[in-house]
């Protein structure tokens, strides 16, 4: 489903829950717009970064960028940093060193996408890697029971999906122009690399 389709589905959901003529329709739409940052300069930020911190590579020669500013934003990123640092098949890598401009349809403005990982393997092939939970790589599923909490969660998932689609479209275009492979790495792929969490 396209981003426009998902946002449209959200609006249909609001209209189904709050009939036309109800003052709640406009309140809900304005609330949604505020939450995703359409009418102000804030960006909606999820609170799923409970595990973050600074990280220092052991193989400084492999790292491209300022090694004193490496921040992992999840235990998945930390594991992948360690994997990149130890893996002899990876000759160079960087964290948030590739910045890709994109247009965020959810906010109606230009943004910058800081790619989680840029890496180069021993064959010379470069990759952009984004680390995401599997659930954020698929369109959100409308909850069967639309409680207030479920509606809010669903709206947040729609926003996240919309932003991810915009970022990944821009990243794919840049990658294609530069002969770089773009990959989204989920918990499934990390487990194949040895992640035990």
Where are the predicted features?
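Electrostatic, structured charged patches in enzyme active sites and in nucleic-acid/phosphate-binding
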Residues: 14, 25, 29-197
């Amino acid at each position: 489903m396209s981003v426009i389709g998902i946002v449209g589905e959200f609006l249909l959901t609001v209209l189904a829950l709050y009939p036309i003529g109800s003052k709640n329709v406009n309140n809900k739409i304005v609330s949604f717009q505020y939450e995703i940052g359409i009418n102000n300069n804030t960006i909606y930020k999820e609170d799923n970064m409970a595990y973050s911190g600074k990280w220092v590579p052991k193989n400084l020669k492999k790292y491209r960028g300022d090694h004193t500013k490496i921040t992992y934003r999840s235990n998945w990123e930390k594991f992948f940093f360690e994997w990149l640092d130890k893996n002899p098949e990876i000759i160079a890598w960087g964290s948030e060193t590739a910045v890709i401009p994109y247009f965020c349809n959810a906010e109606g403005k230009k943004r910058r996408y800081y790619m989680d990982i840029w890496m180069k393997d021993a064959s010379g092939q470069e990759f952009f890697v984004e680390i995401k939970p599997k659930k954020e790589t698929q369109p959100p599923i409308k909850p069967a029971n639309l409680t207030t909490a479920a509606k809010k969660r669903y709206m947040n998932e729609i926003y996240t999906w919309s932003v991810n689609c915009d970022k990944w479209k821009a990243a794919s275009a840049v990658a294609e122009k530069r002969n770089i492979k773009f990959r989204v790495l989920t918990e499934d792929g990390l487990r194949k690399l040895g992640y035990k969490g």
